[in-house]
Amino acid sequence: MTKKRHLFTSESVTEGHPDKICDQISDSILDAILSKDANARVACETTVTTGLVLVAGEITTSTYVDIPKIVRETIQGIGYTRAKYGFDAETCAVLTSIDEQSADIAMGVDQALEAREGQMTDAEIEAIGAGDQGLMFGFACNETQELMPLPISLAHKLARRLTEVRKNDTLSYLRPDGKTQVTVEYDENGKPVRVDTIVISTQHHPDVTWEEIDRDLKEHVIKAVVPAELIDGETKFFINPTGRFVIGGPQGDAGLTGRKIIVDTYGGYARHGGGAFSGKDATKVDRSAAYAARYVAKNIVAAGLAEKAEVQLAYAIGVAQPVSISVDTFGTGKVSEDVLVELVRNNFDLRPAGIIKMLDLRRPIYKQTAAYGHFGRTDVDLSWERTDKAVALKEQAGL
């Protein structure tokens, strides 16, 4: 059966989107705790609405952090600094409801040995079980330099640029909330050939005209980000297609941590296990194993063993070894998928404590991942984006 040309779409959102405000608050609290207590257990959820922030969850730590202060600093950094936005850092109410981690969960994860970070023997790593059951996916492909699908890569770059031109006053009438969406056309061989559609919706000052926004975003955002060779006379642009976007942020929509899991990962191009990332420390495999799966997939593609690779990991609560590891190369593999699974087992320690050690995940590195994607980032140094295993994988595969 011959393949046909087809379209694929992914979206991103700016850091001022209500759900992303929540992700950033949750990860800012996580970072503040990890900077003082590397072995803390954190599961921190945030919700925002007009004039209100609620932080809830389970935190077990030997340190203290000023949660309302962190919340206000995060909101201020995003740009909600005026009461007329319907939400601002100084006047919003901040409520907290924090408990300790359940003793039943801790029993499956805790070991006194865990405090000896970096000194754990294999037996000690084996003794630390996963904090929950679940399945996680990681993906990589050779469509972009960062080995990510092109639609989500462009959508993130547009969203980041939208924030840049707001914060550097190139377009001072912009306000923090915004969304981007990119549709890419793929040829018969599954290669991206052109951008078919770009959608940008951005919050703005009430006095600016739609014509001005349309002109400025094409000039200062789209042209600055999307390679000219991907845009042609047939490319469609929808800039603020409703015509007006003044009420936004938490005044326009309530926000919640963990509600942008597709934006956070691969834009729908790969499968997703359902677990969110933000506000969770690295003993939560929802986060750490998804990072490890990306690390594995990226190294497989970087090694030239496949053009595309999707890795699935699965865990049982309290058990260290993954209950399953699978690799799908969508017919692009240079070696069989059975061989790839064996290479993965031999080169990556995918037990929870092994992942933490391998990727050095007990550091306060998470707030920077809470907007514009956790994968394919070229603006920050993330351990799971390294391709340091590629040479060994290629050699062991005999290529």
UniProtKB/Swiss-Prot annotation:
User: What UniProt keywords apply to this chain's record, in alphabetical order?
Assistant: ATP-binding, Cytoplasm, Magnesium, Metal-binding, Nucleotide-binding, One-carbon metabolism, Potassium, Transferase
Pathway recorded for this protein: Amino-acid biosynthesis; S-adenosyl-L-methionine biosynthesis; S-adenosyl-L-methionine from L-methionine: step 1/1
Give one GO biological process term.
S-adenosylmethionine biosynthetic process
- Gene Ontology CC entries for this record: cytoplasm
Requisite cofactors: Mg(2+); K(+)
Region Flexible loop: start-end pairs = 101-111
Give the record's cofactor note, including how many are bound.
Answer: Binds 2 divalent ions per subunit. Binds 1 potassium ion per subunit.
Compartments (UniProt record): Cytoplasm
Q: Which enzyme type, at the first EC level? A: transferase
Does Cytoplasm appear among the keywords? yes
Entries under NCBIfam families matching the protein: metK
State the oligomer form and interacting partners: Homotetramer; dimer of dimers.
Q: What is this protein called?
A: S-adenosylmethionine synthase
Q: What is the lineage of its organism?
A: Bacteria, Bacillati, Bacillota, Bacilli, Bacillales
Quick one: which gene encodes this? metK
